[in-house]
């Protein structure tokens, strides 16, 4: 019975830490997206902030920096 309780405590700890990592990753991704939108739309050329999230814009940026 004690081993089961120890396993439950360990698995509970692991689940809590995993949820914390997932939450931090989600918040980090959200902050990155908001930062890109603010930087491109407000501080940049003043274009549509949502444009930076489109794949076409990223292809254009990659082409600009790599020359491919």
From Swiss-Prot:
InterPro entries documented for this protein: RNApol_su_b/EpuA (IPR024596)
Pfam families named in the record: EpuA
Superkingdom of this protein's organism: Bacteria
Protein name according to UniProt: Protein EpuA
Species of the source: Streptococcus pneumoniae serotype 4 (strain ATCC BAA-334 / TIGR4)
Native organism taxonomy: Bacteria, Bacillati, Bacillota, Bacilli, Lactobacillales
């Amino acid at each position: 019975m004690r081993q089961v309780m120890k396993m439950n405590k360990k698995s509970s700890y692991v689940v809590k830490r995993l949820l914390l990592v997932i939450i931090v990753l989600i918040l980090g991704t959200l902050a990155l997206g908001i930062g890109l939108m603010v930087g491109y739309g407000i501080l940049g050329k003043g274009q549509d902030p949502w444009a930076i999230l489109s794949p076409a814009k990223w292809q254009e940026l990659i082409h600009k920096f790599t020359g491919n």
